[in-house]
Amino acid sequence: MAIYTPNKSSDANSESSSLRVIFFGNELPNDDLQTHFRRLHTRSKDKNHPLLARFIDEATLVLKEEISALSTDLGRLIPTFETVLQWSEDANASLREGLLCGAIDGVLLVVLQLASYICYHEILTYDKEECVHIALTGLGIGLLSSTAVSLAPTPSHLPLAGADVVRLAFRLGIHVLGVSELLEARDVSGKPASWAYLVQIADSDAAQAELDLLYGNAESSANSNKIIISAVSQTSIVASGPPSRLKLLFNKSPLFRNARSTALPVFGGLCHAAHIYGENDARSIVECASLNTVTENCTPLLPIYSTSTGNPYLANNATETFECVISELLRKQICWDNVINGIRERINYSGASAAAVDHFGNSASLHDLEVALKSVLHESQVTLTNILTMSCVPPPKEISPRSTGLSKLAIVGMACRLPGGATDTEKFWDILVKGLDVSRKVPADRFDIETHYDPTGKQMNKSMTQYGCFIDEPGLFDAPFFNMSPREAQTTDPQMRLALVTAYEALEQAGYVGNRTNSTKLERIGTYYGQAADDYREVNQGQEVSTYYIPGGCRAFGPGRINYFFKFAGPSYSIDTACSSGLAAIEVACQGLWNGVIDTAVAGGVNVLTNPDGFAGLCNGHFLTKGHNACKTWDSTADGYCRADGIGSLVIKRLEDAEADNDNILGIILGAGTNHSAEAVSITHPHAGHQAYLSRQVLRQAGVDPLDVSYVELHGTGTQAGDYEEMQGILDVYAPLTKRRSADNPLHIGAVKANLGHGESVAGTTALMKVLLMFREQAIPPHIGIKGEINPKIPKDLAKRNLHIPMNLESWRRRSDKKRLAVVNNFGAAGGNTTMVLEEAPIRCIEEMDPRQTHVISVSAKTKNSLVGNIERLIAYLDSNPDTSLADLSYTTMARRYQHSWRVAMAPSTMKDLKKQLSAYLEKIDLVKPAGKSGPPTVAFTFTGQGASHKSMNLALYHDVPSFRDYIQRLDAIAQGQGFPSFIPAIDGSHPQDHQHSAVVTQLALVCSEMAMAQYWFSLGIKPDVVIGHSLGEYAAMHVAGVISASDTIFMVGRRAQLLQEKCKLGSHSMVAVRASLEEIKQNTSSTDSDAEFTIACINGPTDTVLSGTKNAIDAVSKTLEQAGFRCTKLDVAFAFHSDQTDPILDEFEDIVKASVSFQEPKMPVISPLLGKVVFDGKTLNANYVRRATRETVDFISALHNAQKMSTISEDTVWIEVGPHAVCTNMIKKILPATKLALPSMRRDADNWKTVSDSLAALHSSGVEIFWNEFHRPFERRLRLLDLPTYSWNNQTYWLQYQGDWCLTKGNGFYGTLGQGSGSAASSSSPSLLASSVSNLHTSTVQCIIEETIDGTNGTVVMQSDLMQPDLYTAAEGHRMNDCAVVTSSIHADIAFTLAEYMLPKLLPASKKLKAIIQDLVVTKGLVANHDRNSPQLFRVTATTTDILHHGLDLTWQNVDNDGTVHEPFATAKITFGDPEQWLSSWSPMVHLVQSRVEALEALVADGTANRFSRAMAYGLFAKNLVDYSEKYRGMQSVIMHGLEGFANVRLTDKESGNWTVPPHFIDSVAHLAGFIMNCSDAINTVDNYCVTPGWKAMQFAKPLTPGARYQSYVKMIPQADNSGTYLGDVYIMQDGDIIGKVWGIEFRRYPRLLLSRFFSAPGKSSTTTTTKASVSAPVKSKPVETKLSAASKPPTVAQTGIPPEQKPAPEVQPVTTNSPATAAAAPASTQAADTDTVSAKALRLIANEAALDLSQLEDDAGFAELGIDSLMSLVIAEKFKIELDVKVGGSLFLDYPTIGDLRKWLEEYYS
């Protein structure tokens, strides 16, 4: 490395007197190797150790490359690893004892030495001059380590050179293994045997002679089997060889047997054996290793002393160096004495007088070297440094991570809604401390447990348990706060709603304010939530699918909604890993922070149970306990878990960001990870091995010793398998028997599920919050899961392992010597495991106090009710915490909380004063109005003139606010640079208040302090919209307006003052302020003689005037006016401005300004007291203006009045006086008495902070946005974030109640058969199909015969079908109207034909030739398919006859509810029978008539009178106007139409699907020509109307309709004479010149197109009209109300009729309810129209109805966004405006008119 580069010119005569020897030993340390590597790992995270981190990364990379090149049998011996440091872990002990032990230990030694070396030199650096002479040496693999140091020219090269050495060490170990295995194969079943022994024989020659004697005879012993002496020293030798041969040696040789010997830890094979290895061995190792290019080009810079010769290697490059060293390791004998002699010679040669030895652990060789050096040098001149000890000391407690991926993560906020009434973490902790089990019976708001419970498990879809752990009132929600309408809130999953609420509360606790700091930038915040079930969507929402079904129910909208509300632009993830979802989501959030994707995460888990299916399914899977208990974790009778609700949210940041942001840290995440139990016996079964592996992995990532963990929160569900497996994993990792915990280091374990049950997707979040509370409370709560005896499967040696299950509340205090560490386990039923390592939060000490005595405190809310609640909560908090710091409270309420529009603000100096003001606000809360409803007010700055301040000021802002002080100092530097004296003595308090400064200093101090004060207001976000300056204050005003620069301002003020001093006589003139109007002064001084002449200097108000003049004149006029009763006050000024005293300077001053100053166009209006007007242009303010302003009158009255006339200012303008005292604000209040707010920046005799705080409180109350963080920034390190009470929600219940027990049946036939018995829900009226089938008949339309009675020619058959059955639904889907699948009359026809064909042979067996005629079909109500395909939609058709031959069959169609309710018929028909041959004969005469009309139409086409349509054109027009047919229905190939007459060429599809008697698409294809004419002909007004058919007189087919066959259809529709909008016609179907079918008297009726949606809309899940069970009013869709909205009061929509009644549709019936919306009479005046039938009144009622709002909420200033009218609802309302009000608007309506008032005015203007 560069710091060690030897001086090339140094020799024996060098002045250097020091030699440094770096000795790399060949032994790993005897103490805890894992601890050394763990500390190096921790150091590598520090930004101060980049080279160490890179070396570890590079070494890991090369090892992975080398391992991938190994043979499969060797490669599989090495487990997967993330970093080479893992090889040192106890878990990898078998690796170090295995077949590859030599390679593994060699790598570990090199990595430890080089990593320690790098770390050491990143901590300390040598003085280059002291380290000119360096010698490197080592033993064994240590010698290889030295090569990296020798070759690296600079420190930055060492990681790459070191990685290459790691590669060679590994390859060397593998090579030696391969050779040694040939010498003697290892017994892998036992422990490895040593290949080398240290033998205490001093005479190495005698030892060699003994060996020669034993192995000298080549015939009796193979050369490769002989024992060699691999190392010699003065007192001993090392004998090496195959282990069995070594044992034989000690048995056979008396010399060796009698000598003391020790087996060395050399298990990898034989080295230092020239008889085994040749030069090619070393060369092959080096050549096979892919050396880094950088290393390959390096040359050795430091000498490495050979352990055989004692001389430095003679190598010219890296390859030669490596070959020399490896060859020596393989072939050469170690002669340590030679090394010692070589270093002695180096000392003698260099003349060194001192030696320093760096080493990596004590050894005999090191001792020999030390003794030798001390024999040459003076003992005191030899020093030894253990680099290993120095570099591996514990790292600093808090490191600075070198990247985000190495940061610790801080949890800074949390909030919850948990069972047992735990609506906050305090209540949660109370449950834990008291050891409560909060399980209870399933509450009624979820489902009726009485009907859904079966302890036997025999009844389908029922739960075998009645119990769970539930949140109280999960429907409570503050919808307006989150900008949600009641409709949206009701439809939104409570999991999402409560996630929003707890996210807000967690962020509130975290002191979050968006964009306050770098880590809170909105673009850098992400949301991560775990959710594993959709109960509310599946059951509650699913009963009435509405606009918000998708955004209110789909999981992605949960975190997405949080991002949207808070305007986070980072990622949002909804994560499902079953029971580990919550903690897995937090782990993903951690990864986002570590990967630098985000800077703040809001994460957690949610679970609200409303679906009984979940209980039933888990019971059937044997997951759940049946008892009235939460989870019986570790109990001998544990039989499953208890389900639980829960919502938990946390806010997480990187630790360094949290500390920089002054956050309260609840706990620190050191590591987190997730894996999968891949080798478990089943997917739901846990696996101890994988759990333990994950624990070790996460601990490694965190740099934590498992024995340092003192608490583990287990998953602990209370299942036999899960508890046992998890306990095994815990014991193996945290409380092993092999490396036991000390007596003072116990491990405690617990499981929160014993208290709260298993929250499934929120379980891990709950467990994490528990541990955070334990950190805070310094206690471990009792475990209550063991109800009786502990599970016998759990090992009995827990006490022996020092592992404890706390049965009582136990202390867990902070320790001074180490931090408390905890682990949270969370496992998923799908096999996922998540583990997190936590550390207690650091203690923050505040040494300095905030110097401010007065502080701004505010309480705010979005509504008045919440404001009252927030004030009350704060008062209660202060009563409970009397020592609360006002400074901290101000910081928390102003800089660290959201500021809402309903607010109160105050600036108390004492806690007593604060509580008094808070109580006063509660008493007058009705006087409080929301701030900023119409936007922030206009702000005006007014700048004070001279004479208002003390002669010497002492500004607290200058002392306390660095930015203010810096700005003043910059201005002062400019002033001094322009030749003026420093003005700081006039403001810093260094002189008494009455100390008189020069005019230059005084005037510069005033103007510069005003500029600095303005800059301070700017820094707080308060910028003026208009400015005005009084006299000298005009200069500061012009600067702030951008007219002149700060430099020019200082120049003009300073030069003018200098001119005054130079050219005007001090004391010759004076000024007086008179409490009189200008007119009064003139009247009372009109007789004054000429010697008493004076000038009107300032007109400050109606009765405030300032006069200037000579001293005598002012004395005289003052006397006169005082005698007249007017108060006169002489001003303490050096010169009389605005008088003739200034005349001598005017010309020169103007010339100077013209020559030196640049005037710019103002950036804001400037109110000019000189001109009495508002200046906007860039020409008025110039050199002449400042000349005139010096001499002429200041007319404040005219200036303000004219500004008001121009609307530049108004009574709502907020005035801030920028100056040393409140002067101008008093003028403004007198001139403009309607002004609401005029505030000072400073007061002459008051503390700066009191004045500023009072003004800020008033500004805040008025709605001015203030950068509160900037206000507190100079003092933030002295302030704490308080954990104040959470927001007081204005909650109401929004809930869709699950009704009935349809989850039990779901329309499945098996329920009726399998569920029969006691308590079965099945009955004879069940809508089940299969349960009651009495026939084998099954077609696509007639799916099940549920009743059949045949008696001669009399009979009844009842069929039942499910419209959702695929074939039937597809048939309906092929006939779409108004984007709904509608059952076409051809489907009814197929049903009729099928029943006729089924019954005829049963009732009249001899009627084989007869075919059916469907007569008098009348459909009174269309059958429209549900949108929800998952719910059955049943209908039945009954066919009855008393005499089939003479009376035919009577058919009725009826809808059937899922509970078996049968409705009134919606269609009827009659079937008769006839002979088709007779039909053909009777139709024959009509053929020529029909054919002639077809020919006539063809002719009309030819002359352009009639229209011809292609297939595509016809069906495209049909779809546009009414019916969108699917492909198989589109049989018309071409159409000719003229008026109401037309014919079509038809070809039926040849693609068959379904089981039909007469396929509906065939019937439609040949018959819907009539419908085409009625909805596409130019003879019909199809724009405003549409036509539908209620049926026909008769339909019959003499021949079957054949797939692929061609036909012709003809029809002429005739309007009826009564002008009722009814049309009749006969459709003829022809084939090959014959009429083969006919639809007689097909009828169409005309209806307004506006009613299309009303009559063709998908119904709810059960179509309800008047039923045959009982006579009840037809229920209709209820109007939702603001408060508790439930499905009970909102039945599904009626199935709309296909044929509307002739009279107008009846209005919707509104249900009677005690909490219905307020009537119009109760609405505010703004919503009351003189005529309630006006468009605007109707529009407001429509909006209120659609959003489920009360009319009283629709006040003029209410914003649609605040009311929850989002883009989706906007589209719905806009569409209803068009349909119901004929108001044509777009979806952007509520963006164009954002408030109720805006919309109402627009409607009244255009639609009145």
From Swiss-Prot:
Residues 1343-1494 are annotated as: N-terminal hotdog fold. Pathway: Pigment biosynthesis. The keyword Phosphoprotein applies. It comes from Claviceps purpurea (strain 20.1). Multidomain protein; including a starter unit:ACP transacylase (SAT) that selects the starter unit; a ketosynthase (KS) that catalyzes repeated decarboxylative condensation to elongate the polyketide backbone; a malonyl-CoA:ACP transacylase (MAT) that selects and transfers the extender unit malonyl-CoA; a product template (PT) domain that controls the immediate cyclization regioselectivity of the reactive polyketide backbone; and an acyl-carrier protein (ACP) that serves as the tether of the growing and completed polyketide via its phosphopantetheinyl arm. Residues 1730-1807 form the Carrier domain. Residues 1343-1653 form the PKS/mFAS DH domain. Non-reducing polyketide synthase; part of the ergochrome gene cluster responsible for the typical purple-black color of the ergot sclerotia. The ergochrome gene cluster produces several ergot pigments including the yellow ergochrome secalonic acid and its derivatives, as well as the red anthraquinones endocrocin and clavorubin. The pathway begins with the synthesis of atrochrysone thioester by the polyketide synthase (PKS) CPUR_05437. The atrochrysone carboxyl ACP thioesterase CPUR_05436 then breaks the thioester bond and releases the atrochrysone carboxylic acid from CPUR_05437. The keyword DNA-binding does not apply. NCBIfam families: PT_fungal_PKS (TIGR04532). This is Non-reducing polyketide synthase CPUR_05437. CDD domains: PKS (cd00833). One of its GO terms (biological process) is secondary metabolite biosynthetic process. Disruption phenotype: Leads to the loss of ergot sclerotia pigmentation via blocking the production of red pigments endocrocin and clavorubin, and of the yellow secalonic acids. Does not affect the ability to infect plants. SMART domains: PKS_AT, PKS_KS. SUPFAM superfamilies: ACP-like, FabD/lysophospholipase-like, Probable ACP-binding domain of malonyl-CoA ACP transacylase, Thiolase-like. Induction: Expression correlates with the formation of the sclerotia and thus the pigment production and is directly regulated by the cluster-specific activator CPUR_05433. Residues 1659-1727 are annotated as: Disordered. The modification O-(pantetheine 4'-phosphoryl)serine is found at residue 1767. Its EC number is 2.3.1.-. Residues 1659-1676, 1713-1727 have a biased composition (Low complexity). Residues 406-840 form the Ketosynthase family 3 (KS3) domain.
